[in-house]
Amino acid sequence: MSKLVRCIAHWAVTRYKCDEVSKAHYHFIYEGDGKEVPGHFTPEANENTADGKYAAHTRHCNTGSIGFSCAAMLGAIDVDRPGKFPITAAQFDAMCAGIARECKKRGIKVTPKTVLSHAEVESNLGIKQRGKWDIAVLPHANLKGAKACGDLIRSTVQAKLERMNQ
């Protein structure tokens, strides 16, 4: 059984292109057109983070977690002002496909504790974060709020998993 037990979705606070900082912090990054870019670390690096060589994407929740991020949201201020680089439908769909792939590969069931956004870590897992709100707005889907966005991530991932299993 895999030691990787959850997938956490983020945004990178960038324009629509992946940068080196994102590659150091996430396992998979999705550019504005949906292109997947691998990070510097494989998900397996996060099976045990004691060596310090892993993708550090979520405070006190990196061990056992795979980090996915949309290259987006530079200039975002709050859910009503997502800036000039909001998450696109293409990258959201590609990220959900990537999460579904990793869930299938590692036997991760889709629940609010195993597939979630960074904005849900504190409420769903009880791990204190520092005011993180990624992903709490999805303008392409006209959604605001961590739970609403997390529910869309989970339902999209689940639908993709079901199609994979047909």
Annotate each predicted stretch with a short phrase.
Residues A9, F68, S117:
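Active-site flanking residues adjacent to catalytic metal/cofactor-binding acidic residues
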